[in-house]
């Protein structure tokens, strides 16, 4: 499996500052290892660029210019809310990215530039923030948008795939007939943490004969090693967490 990164800069969305025993499983999108201590500053002074040489050891760079100013703009537009939704959680809020029209536009443009000539007919968005980024990408590349939702959110007949959480399981669903065998799809979410949700989305689409071209996220939290759950499916991210 291959991970392609435009520029690794900031951690995103749900990152814990609380201590958690290393042998406990991590809830997707909600937990980070105890070694991660993240700044709650929005300024780019709190961000760190990885050199292209260092990054290339683990990941192929998607652009020759790893200091693309658009990436810095996207990274700095994400604010951190401490102790939300629970004490100890550093919630990295992408709503501030959406309020910044240039940063939001650049986010979509970077994905569109990557996928516009790859014969993609399906953009599958993972609930809930995949619904923000998926539709404009789908419209721009001439693909349909397929929502992948939590249980009992979609009317009519659905097909489901279960995945593991820290305590118990969850399920992701999509409509029967939303995709056809042989279609080419990308799966969009704002964040990959432990990778459980994206892995379930891959399995669900592959069960009905869809070819997964790639998973794409705004942010990767590499410390959680979520990309390892994606098997042979490559991962494309715009920014990467820096502890």
Curated annotation (Swiss-Prot):
Optimum pH is 8.8. The gene is APT1. Catalyzes a salvage reaction resulting in the formation of AMP, that is energically less costly than de novo synthesis. Contributes primarily to the recycling of adenine into adenylate nucleotides, but is also involved in the inactivation of cytokinins by phosphoribosylation. Catalyzes the conversion of cytokinins from free bases (active form) to the corresponding nucleotides (inactive form). Belongs to the purine/pyrimidine phosphoribosyltransferase family. Pathway: Purine metabolism; AMP biosynthesis via salvage pathway; AMP from adenine: step 1/1. NCBIfam families: apt (TIGR01090), PRK02304.1-3 (NF002634), PRK02304.1-5 (NF002636). It comes from Arabidopsis thaliana (Mouse-ear cress). GO terms for molecular function: adenine phosphoribosyltransferase activity. Changing residue 195 to D: In apt1-8; loss of activity and male sterility. It comes from the Eukaryota. PANTHER family: ADENINE PHOSPHORIBOSYLTRANSFERASE, ADENINE PHOSPHORIBOSYLTRANSFERASE 1, CHLOROPLASTIC. Plants with reduced activity of APT1 and increased levels of cellular adenine show enhanced stress tolerance and improve growth, leading to increases in plant biomass. The keyword RNA-binding does not apply. This is Adenine phosphoribosyltransferase 1, chloroplastic.
């Amino acid at each position: 499996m291959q991970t392609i990164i435009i520029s690794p800069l900031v951690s995103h969305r749900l990152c814990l500052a609380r201590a958690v025993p290393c042998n406990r499983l991590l809830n997707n999108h909600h937990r980070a290892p105890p070694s991660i201590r993240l700044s709650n500053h929005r300024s780019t002074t709190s961000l760190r660029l990885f050199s292209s040489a260092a990054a290339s050891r683990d990941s192929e760079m998607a652009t020759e210019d790893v200091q693309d100013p658009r990436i810095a703009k996207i990274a700095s537009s994400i604010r951190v809310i401490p102790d939300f939704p629970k004490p100890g959680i550093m919630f990295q809020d992408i709503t501030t990215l959406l309020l910044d029209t240039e940063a939001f536009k650049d986010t979509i443009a970077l994905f569109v530039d990557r996928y516009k000539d790859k014969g993609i007919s399906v953009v599958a968005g993972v609930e809930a923030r995949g619904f923000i980024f998926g539709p404009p990408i789908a419209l721009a590349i001439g693909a349909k948008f397929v929502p992948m939702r939590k249980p009992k959110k979609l009317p009519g007949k659905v097909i489901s795939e279960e995945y593991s959480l820290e305590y118990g399981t969850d399920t992701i669903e999509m409509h029967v007939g939303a995709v056809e065998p042989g279609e080419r799809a990308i799966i969009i979410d704002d964040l990959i943490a432990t990778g459980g949700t994206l892995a379930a989305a891959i399995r669900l689409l592959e069960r009905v004969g869809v070819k997964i071209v790639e998973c794409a996220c705004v942010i990767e939290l590499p410390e959680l090693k979520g990309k390892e759950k994606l098997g042979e499916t490559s991962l494309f991210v715009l920014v990467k967490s820096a502890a």
